[in-house]
Amino acid sequence: MIKIDTSEIDKFVIDLKDTSENIRSDVQKVLKKSGFNIGARAKGNITNNGSVKTGHLRRGITTDIGNMEVTVHTSNIKYARGVEEGTRPHTIRAKNKKALYWKDAKHPVKSVRHPGSKAKPFLIPAFEKEKEVIMKDLEKIVKW
């Protein structure tokens, strides 16, 4: 009869499992920190690139922390994409009324031609700046 002692293998598996949980926890910390950094940078970019009129877009930037993921987004702000990417020329029509009217307009109109707007990116540049920091922090965790 041959008896094999597996106690060392069992210890190794337990250590590996503990290490895996520690790595997972460290990665989550890096993602959380970077998510909040990206959100803060994006808010700063909005202020710096002249996109602020009411502050609604800046206040709408939120960071959601999940399990091994972080999402930085603009919550329920329909025009955020237009600010980030710009818009093509388009026609604006009255939806709920018969005509459009604004202060200093000579008379109401059924539609107006908008020339489009240049992109004023705020979210992508914030991510691009933080990307290198994320990668360096993750490399430190993996190199144990």
Model-assigned labels for residue ranges:
Residues 79-85:
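Short, cysteine-centered beta-strand-loop-beta hairpins and adjacent loop/turn segments enriched
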Residues 1-78, 93-144:
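Short, Lys/Arg-rich flexible segments
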Residues 89-90:
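Short, His- and charge-rich active-site/binding loops that engage polyanionic ligands
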